[in-house]
Amino acid sequence: MITRNSIILRRLYPTAIIRTLATDATESTVVKTKRRRTIFTDELNKGPSFDDFVSGKAKDMLEDPLETARKDPNAKLPSWLKVPIPKGKSFHNVKKDVRELKLATVCEEAKCPNIGECWGGKKSEATATIMLLGDTCTRGCRFCSVKTNRKPAAPDPMEPENTAEAISRWGLGYVVLTTVDRDDLVDGGARHLAETVQKIKQKAPQILVEVLGGDFRGDLSMVEILANSGLDVYAHNLETVEALTPHIRDRRATYRQSLAVLERAKQTNSSLITKTSLMLGFGETDDQVKQTLRDLREIGCDVVTFGQYMRPTKRHMKVVEYIKPEKFDYWRDTALDMGFLYVASGPLVRSSYKAGEAFIENVLKKRKHNVGETPRLAQEIKPSIY
């Protein structure tokens, strides 16, 4: 606001002098305060000085974070989660064919710790898990390391043929076909999966085929298409207990929807083996796991596997607890007592881990010898899974 005094000052004194007087008056009234100390400042003060760097003493004062983590026992994985580096002729042959035929495998994309054991086994025991419909998922679950995108590339029309060719070439006894979720496709990729199964059976009818499929956004007619494709095992993973599902899986995947998928598969083709997998270590309780097993038995699910959740990267959710091997034994015995046809349970067990062994040594032997009490059979043939 312009006052009479300010007009008089402007007439008597030049503008520069007025600005100087105003600045001096302001500075005289400002009380200078010390800058607040910060954690960063404190850390700098604790560290080496410029003279320490010049004299070479700094290297003795600084800690290498990688070396510190290596020496810290709490930063290490438990001994039961360590695996040898993948190697061997069979392993490299499978890897070579995967590259040549431009196939994607969940073994590599999901950084599975069992890749060396599954790919490196004998032909009759080896298991490969081929990931169809590309390597990019339309969903983003907090535990999964597979790439995500709302609009992945269109499916390769030659993928069913190339997959069947590769599998027949390897001479595997069992193959697992899995897939990324393709919510961008009208049928969710169900017909693409069914075609792949049919081509495999045409080229190598002796191979047992398991398909680990998605929920097709709850469209159960797509489940029926896949269940009637000629596959031997229909798998769909619950991943975790009901209470934790919204926090761990993509919001489009629900616990009840997954149960409905497994139930419809069995209703469509009663000869199918239905299978699911649970990861432990998210903070689930024993009561929650037991309720999940009861829910699975109510819909007639035949096979369940338990494995330890292992954080793929720092961008994914943290591990709440590393479950001990003894606890996995407990869950195996508990599930068998509830009537599951077969249970694989161990820290390194994954949905498709030793799938061929599980199916061949349990289901086929049961059918061949007409064994009545399945849980007892499964207990007698407990494989070494860790």
From Swiss-Prot:
Classification via Gene3D superfamilies: Aldolase class I
Entry EC number(s): 2.8.1.8
Cofactor annotation comment: Binds 2 [4Fe-4S] clusters per subunit. One cluster is coordinated with 3 cysteines and an exchangeable S-adenosyl-L-methionine.
Cofactor: [4Fe-4S] cluster
Record pathway: Protein modification; protein lipoylation via endogenous pathway; protein N(6)-(lipoyl)lysine from octanoyl-[acyl-carrier-protein]: step 2/2
Catalytic activity: [[Fe-S] cluster scaffold protein carrying a second [4Fe-4S](2+) cluster] + N(6)-octanoyl-L-lysyl-[protein] + 2 oxidized [2Fe-2S]-[ferredoxin] + 2 S-adenosyl-L-methionine + 4 H(+) = [[Fe-S] cluster scaffold protein] + N(6)-[(R)-dihydrolipoyl]-L-lysyl-[protein] + 4 Fe(3+) + 2 hydrogen sulfide + 2 5'-deoxyadenosine + 2 L-methionine + 2 reduced [2Fe-2S]-[ferredoxin]
Matching SUPFAM superfamilies: Radical SAM enzymes
Keyword set, alphabetical order: 4Fe-4S, Iron, Iron-sulfur, Metal-binding, Mitochondrion, S-adenosyl-L-methionine, Transferase
Domain Radical SAM core: 122-341
Cell compartment(s), UniProt: Mitochondrion
Entry's transmembrane regions: none
EC primary class: transferase
Gene Ontology MF terms in the entry: 4 iron, 4 sulfur cluster binding; lipoate synthase activity; metal ion binding
Subcellular location, principal: mitochondrion
Highest taxon of the lineage: Eukaryota
GO cellular component: mitochondrion
Binding site for [4Fe-4S] cluster 1: C107, C112, C118, S352
PANTHER family the UniProt entry points to: LIPOYL SYNTHASE, LIPOYL SYNTHASE, MITOCHONDRIAL
Cited HAMAP family: Lipoyl_synth (MF_00206)
Stated family: Belongs to the radical SAM superfamily. Lipoyl synthase family.
Additional information: This protein may be expected to contain an N-terminal transit peptide but none has been predicted.
UniProt protein name: Lipoyl synthase, mitochondrial
Species of the source: Candida dubliniensis (strain CD36 / ATCC MYA-646 / CBS 7987 / NCPF 3949 / NRRL Y-17841) (Yeast)
